[in-house]
């Protein structure tokens, strides 16, 4: 994976950490644009969707005869979409939008809207914020636990008003969390996977191989008058547990219990017959 940090990147991280995204409208009026991670989940989703909508607007072919009309139409559409974002992230959205709308030329106005949006995206690390927000929404508890256990980092510091952790820094830590931790276990399906890395699976395979070898040895040297030794069971793996363990009280659980009782009864009868 590409290294996220360079010396220049560290320098920018330190500088930006203390600088809010502030847009000056006049000498005495400023508007702050909140980072994505400080929005509620629904607001975050709406912002991400709006940004994606802007990015998906196709380029205009300058050779197209209708290009002039399309440019104005696209410009108005861009302003409309970006205004939705400003209403969610700006502390004074009406003043910001009114200031931008003072420009009469729709093309220049659209460029102004887009420039403010791009500035916010860069300064707040939107890409990393979006990825991190999605992970926190799905696996927040596990990430909180792992960051504290492995790095001594409190995830809540990401949301502090003063000296917050940067999204890029936290995302980098999350990406490189150990595979044996709670985060990767949750991504794979649940905490039953915790601790199960390549080494654990290899040990389970070795255990099964040794048990199988012992069983073959017992079968080759057994007394034919005595019952056959039971075949060894495979070492339980989280994948098997997830597939074969039905919910207590469910119909599947009752079927499993009935089959187990019938099998045990049959084994007792065979043992008594011999």
Curated annotation (Swiss-Prot):
Signal peptide: none annotated. Promotes tail assembly by creating a scaffold for the tail tube proteins. The tail assembly proteins Gp24 and Gp25 would wrap the linear tape measure protein to create a tail assembly scaffold. It would allow polymerization of tail tube protein during which Gp24 and Gp25 are released and therefore are absent from the mature virion. The tail assembly protein Gp25 is produced by a rare -1 ribosomal frameshift. The ratio Gp24/Gp25 is important for proper tail assembly. Keywords: Viral release from host cell, Viral tail assembly. GO terms for biological process: viral tail assembly; viral translational frameshifting. Interacts with tail assembly protein Gp24 and tape measure protein. Belongs to the L5likevirus tail assembly protein family. Residues 236-245 have a biased composition (Basic and acidic residues). It holds the Pfam family GP24_25. This is Tail assembly protein Gp25. Residues 221-250 are annotated as: Disordered.
């Amino acid at each position: 994976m590409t290294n996220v940090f360079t010396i220049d990147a560290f320098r920018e991280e330190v500088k930006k950490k203390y600088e809010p995204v502030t847009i000056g409208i006049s000498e005495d009026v400023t508007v702050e644009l909140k980072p994505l991670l400080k929005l509620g989940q629904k607001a975050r989703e709406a912002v991400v969707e709006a940004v994606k909508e802007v990015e998906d607007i196709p380029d205009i072919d300058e050779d197209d005869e209708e290009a002039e009309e399309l440019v104005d139409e696209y410009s108005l559409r861009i302003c409309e979409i970006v205004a939705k974002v400003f209403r969610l992230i700006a502390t004074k959205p009406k003043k910001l939008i009114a200031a931008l709308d003072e420009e009469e030329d729709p093309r220049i106005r659209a460029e102004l809207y887009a420039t403010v949006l791009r500035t916010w995206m860069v300064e707040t690390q939107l890409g990393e914020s979006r990825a991190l927000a999605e992970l926190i929404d799905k696996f927040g508890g596990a990430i909180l636990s792992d960051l504290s256990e492995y790095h001594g980092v409190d995830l809540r510091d990401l949301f502090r008003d003063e000296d917050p952790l940067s999204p890029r820094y936290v995302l980098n830590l999350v990406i490189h969390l150990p595979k044996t931790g709670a985060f990767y276990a949750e991504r794979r399906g649940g905490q039953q996977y915790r601790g199960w890395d390549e080494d654990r699976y290899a040990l389970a395979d070795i255990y099964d191989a040794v048990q199988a070898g012992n069983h073959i040895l017992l079968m080759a040297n057994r007394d034919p008058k005595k019952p056959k030794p039971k075949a060894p069971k495979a070492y339980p793996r989280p994948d098997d547990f997830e597939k074969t363990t039905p919910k207590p009280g469910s119909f599947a659980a009752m079927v499993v219990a009935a089959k187990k009782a019938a099998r045990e009864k049959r084994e007792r009868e065979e043992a008594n017959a011999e």
